[in-house]
């Protein structure tokens, strides 16, 4: 298997020339943030609607889902309403409804409140919710697992795998047990090849694999 695959450059590159275990999935999602988890959830929903069974794997570099998510956010619940109808009855994380907005124009010595009619729509939050995005992401992870999605936290993706024809075939997770020079120690554990018919990169805007593609 490894002989027919190439590797794209990435961060914390795995040691070359060693045999690695491999797992096959229909879809491999890199990144267990809101986008990656929503993708996994929707794919499983669509498969169920067609009476199909697909395997979906999500890998996350953080020690747990939500560990690398900014702590706070104001969210528009419309996406949750579409993705998970009835989500409010499914034990979501604590949320506070946004009831008022204040936009202030600040000078060196004064502040001026911008009237509601002059506030840009993107800055109006009536009907939205204030929530810990880390908690929301962990909750989404639970919803995904309930649908049969396999989530592997603590497994950073280190490289992209390509076929001989240059198609993305999956990713290699980072090796563990390396010294400061990147050489294997006695505790060395090679990363795994996670192979998918489709690979979704949901690392965020600073994802190193996305920059390498």
Question: In which residue ranges do the predicted regions lie?
Answer:
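N-terminal Rossmann-fold NAD(P) dinucleotide-binding loop
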Residues: 36
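Extended hydrophobic secondary-structure segments that form protein cores and membrane-embedded regions
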Residues: 27, 55-63, 196-201
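Extreme N-terminal leader/targeting segments of oxidoreductases
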Residues: 1-28, 42-57, 178
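Helix-loop-beta segment of a Rossmann-like dinucleotide-binding subdomain
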Residues: 112-133, 142, 170
């Amino acid at each position: 298997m490894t002989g027919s695959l190439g590797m794209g450059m990435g961060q914390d590159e795995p040691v070359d020339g060693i045999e690695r275990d491999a797992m096959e999935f229909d879809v491999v999602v890199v990144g267990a943030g809101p986008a990656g988890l929503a993708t996994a959830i929707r794919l499983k929903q669509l498969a169920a609607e067609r009476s199909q069974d697909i395997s979906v794997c999500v890998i996350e570099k953080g020690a747990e889902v939500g560990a690398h998510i900014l702590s706070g956010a104001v969210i528009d619940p419309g996406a949750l309403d579409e993705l998970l109808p009835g989500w409010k009855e499914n034990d979501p994380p604590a949320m506070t409804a946004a009831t008022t907005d204040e936009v202030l124009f600040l000078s060196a010595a004064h502040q001026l409140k911008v009237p509601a009619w002059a506030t840009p729509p993107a800055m109006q939050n009536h009907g939205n919710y204030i929530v810990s995005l880390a908690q929301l992401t962990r909750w989404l992870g639970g919803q995904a697992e309930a649908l049969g999605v396999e989530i592997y936290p603590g497994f950073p993706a280190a490289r992209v795998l390509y076929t001989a024809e240059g198609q993305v075939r999956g990713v290699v997770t980072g090796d563990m047990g390396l010294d400061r020079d990147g050489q294997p120690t006695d505790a060395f554990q090679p990363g795994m090849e996670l192979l998918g018919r489709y690979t979704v990169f949901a690392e965020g805007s600073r994802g190193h694999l996305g920059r390498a593609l």
